[in-house]
């Protein structure tokens, strides 16, 4: 709300940005998903969406175990699939997002915007870009892991 005099700040703290992936998403009957499994910077909204993909993947496996009597080894597959993609994809993409948002150099920002315009102008590049940032590429990669 605009006002004539400045606001007084009662408290402030620096938010430390972390980039980590748990060593395992499974330890016996304990399973990790979302922020419990992987922490990344909040710029770009990737953490919550990636956590939803963890949940969908894990829920499908738990349903097969519960309803179909599938082996609990499926939970190790969950770990392999989602941890691998968190390391290969989520960490890389969130670090890239942070660098892009925090660019200080006008020339670097201009080059980045030019790159985005080139992506938009090329249908194949645009499709590849959207598959990556929408996490569809990551889901496909995870599903390919056996």
Where is each model-derived feature located?
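FAD/FMN-dependent oxidoreductases across multiple families
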Residues: 1-46
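C-terminal helical "tail/cap" subdomain of flavin- and related membrane-associated enzymes
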Residues: 3, 23, 45, 61-146
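Alpha-helical hinge/cap motifs
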Residues: 47-51
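Short amphipathic alpha-helical face segments that pack within enzyme cores
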Residues: 53-60
